[in-house]
């Protein structure tokens, strides 16, 4: 299976372990991520219309191997799956999606007519505390949701569902999994001293956050629930909690 993500650092988070996790479960998945930090649907579309080769091309969760445009990426290989997503700072603002999501989907299907299209539902920011341990960007964006994690979750989920339906794509519900882990499992609830699933207030933690995203992608795209017995040097008990939460996810 070959996957292309037209994304940013949030798809970078999701891709980090996906290739390796798939291999550990007897599957071959090769991923390509088109990375510009914080890139929105609007910016992706502008880059297409100007044919800008400004994306870092990252294979299988690794470092960038060069610069490329979206069109170059789409014609350079045949993909089974192409994913789209909105930038996190706009993920819960519905008017930021149009007309760019439809334009992007049509462009992808023009060059990859056999590929299945998925929309990557991203996740909320960490709960706000004062004084905040996070920076100004976190503060500025989270203010759009009144520093309310539940409000941000509901808005970005509503937007993801609308966007996916609009372009006839399936959802990869990473945001719902992260929200469930934070709310329903003490081991990942920061209020009870659990592991924080973010490393800076918005990007996923380098261990369990990124593992959760990869596991959700693997299950959504292949139907295979990963074996949590061992991965990297992570705690198998925590991996089990993440994996056991995945089949329960509904949007």
Please identify what each model-predicted range represents:
Residues 67-206, 219:
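Alpha-helical cap/lid subdomain in secreted, periplasmic
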Residues 2-4, 10-98:
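Conserved SGNH/GDSL esterase-like catalytic core that processes O-acyl groups on lipids
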Residues 187-251:
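Conserved catalytic region of serine esterases and O-acyltransferases that act on ester linkages
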């Amino acid at each position: 299976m070959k996957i292309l993500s037209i994304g940013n650092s949030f798809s970078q988070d999701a891709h980090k372990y996906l290739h390796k996790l798939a291999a550990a479960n007897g599957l071959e998945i090769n991923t390509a991520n088109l990375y510009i930090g914080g890139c929105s649907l609007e910016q992706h579309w502008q880059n297409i219309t100007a044919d800008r080769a400004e994306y870092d091309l990252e294979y299988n969760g690794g470092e960038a191997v060069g610069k490329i445009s979206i069109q170059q990426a789409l014609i350079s290989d045949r993909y089974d799956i192409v994913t789209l997503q909105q930038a996190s700072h706009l993920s819960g603002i519905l008017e930021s999606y149009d007309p760019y999501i439809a334009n992007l989907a049509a462009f992808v299907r023009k060059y990859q007519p056999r590929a299945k299209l998925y929309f990557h539902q991203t996740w909320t920011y960490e709960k706000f505390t004062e004084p905040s341990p996070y920076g100004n960007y976190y503060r500025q964006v989270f203010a759009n949701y009144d520093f309310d994690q539940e409000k941000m979750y509901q808005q970005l989920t509503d937007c993801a569902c609308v966007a996916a339906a609009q372009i006839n794509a399936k959802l990869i519900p990473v945001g719902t999994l992260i929200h469930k882990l934070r709310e329903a499992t003490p081991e990942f609830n920061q209020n009870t001293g659990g592991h924080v699933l973010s490393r800076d207030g918005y990007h996923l933690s380098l261990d369990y956050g990124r593992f959760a995203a990869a596991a959700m992608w693997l299950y959504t795209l292949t139907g295979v629930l990963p074996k949590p017995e061992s991965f990297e040097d992570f705690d198998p008990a925590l991996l089990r909690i993440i994996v056991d939460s995945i089949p329960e996810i509904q949007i």
